[in-house]
Amino acid sequence: MNLVPTVIEQSSRGERAYDIYSRLLKDRIIMLSGPIEDDMANAIIAQLLFLDAQDSTKDISLYINSPGGVVSSGLAIYDTMNFIQSDVQTITLGMAASMASVLASSGTKGKRFALPHAQVMIHQPSGGAQGQQTEIEIAAREILKTRELINKILAENSGQPIERLNQDTERDNYLSAQEAVDYGLIDHIMTNSSEQKK
C-alpha cells in the first residue's frame, strides 16, 4: 500500500492541503523513486516541463532513489533533462542503479550530488528474447546498440574513456558516493542541504 502524506499550509485565505509531492514541486523538487517505467517517466517529464515553463532561470532539484528500469523510459527523462533550459541538480540518496545511474550522472555539471551513504550501480542493460531465431538476433543487436548508447552517455558524463566503461559495466559495478565522485559520475557529496548550490 502506497500512502502519500498530506501537508497542510496556513495562509491569509485559510488552510490548504497538498500531497507531499505537490508541495515539494512548489519548491522545484521532483522525486524520482522506485522503478523507472512509462507512467513514472511521464510524470517526471511533465514536472520538468512545467517547472521549466514556470521559470527557466531557476534550478530544478531531482532527487533519485531508484533501482533503474525500462531504458526507453529513462532515456525519455534524460532527453527532457537536456531539452529544458533550467539547470537540473541531481541528488542521489539510497541507490541510483542501472538507468537511474545514467540520470544521476546527467544532471548539470557541478550540480550532481550524492548523500554520504548513497550508492551508484552501473552495468550493461539486460533483456530477454524468445521466438524465432531471427527475432532473437534482432533483440540481441538491439541490446548491443542500447549498451553502446548507455556507455557513451556515461563516458560523456564521467569523462572516462569508453573502453573503461565497456569493461566496468561488464557486470554489476557498485560504487559508494566517494567512488562515484572519483569516477566522475557525481560532483559532490552533500552532508547538509546548505551545501546545495542554488
From Swiss-Prot:
Q: Which residues form the active site?
A: S98, H123
Read off the InterPro entries from this record.
ClpP (IPR001907), ClpP/crotonase-like_dom_sf (IPR029045), ClpP/TepA (IPR023562), ClpP_His_AS (IPR033135), ClpP_Ser_AS (IPR018215)
Q: List, alphabetically, the PANTHER family matched.
A: ATP-DEPENDENT CLP PROTEASE PROTEOLYTIC SUBUNIT
Keyword Kinase applies:
no
Q: Where in the cell is it found?
A: Cytoplasm
**Recorded E.C. number(s)?**
3.4.21.92
- Which BP terms does GO give this entry? protein quality control for misfolded or incompletely synthesized proteins
What job does the chain carry out?
A: Cleaves peptides in various proteins in a process that requires ATP hydrolysis. Has a chymotrypsin-like activity. Plays a major role in the degradation of misfolded proteins.
The molecular function terms of the Gene Ontology recorded here are: ATP-dependent peptidase activity; ATPase binding; serine-type endopeptidase activity
User: By which gene is this protein encoded?
Assistant: clpP
Catalytic function, reaction form: Hydrolysis of proteins to small peptides in the presence of ATP and magnesium. alpha-casein is the usual test substrate. In the absence of ATP, only oligopeptides shorter than five residues are hydrolyzed (such as succinyl-Leu-Tyr-|-NHMec, and Leu-Tyr-Leu-|-Tyr-Trp, in which cleavage of the -Tyr-|-Leu- and -Tyr-|-Trp bonds also occurs)
Read off the lineage from the record: Bacteria, Bacillati, Bacillota, Bacilli, Lactobacillales
Question: Top-level EC class, please?
Answer: hydrolase
Q: Which HAMAP family match?
A: ClpP
Q: How does it assemble?
A: Fourteen ClpP subunits assemble into 2 heptameric rings which stack back to back to give a disk-like structure with a central cavity, resembling the structure of eukaryotic proteasomes.
Q: Name one GO cellular component term.
A: cytoplasm
Keywords recorded for this protein, A-Z: Cytoplasm, Hydrolase, Protease, Serine protease
The text of the family note is:
Belongs to the peptidase S14 family.
Q: Which Pfam families match?
A: CLP_protease (PF00574)
KW Phosphoprotein (keyword) present: no
- The protein's name: ATP-dependent Clp protease proteolytic subunit
User: Where mainly found?
Assistant: cytoplasm
